[in-house]
From Swiss-Prot:
Name assigned to this protein: Unknown protein from spot 2D-0014LD of 2D-PAGE of liver tissue
Provenance organism: Mus musculus (Mouse)
Additional comment: On the 2D-gel the determined pI of this unknown protein is: 6.0, its MW is: 12.5 kDa.
Domain of life, source organism: Eukaryota
Length: 9
């Protein structure tokens, strides 16, 4: 699929 939520704090 497609992951458009990649946020690493």
């Amino acid at each position: 699929x497609x992951n458009e939520r990649k946020v690493i704090q």
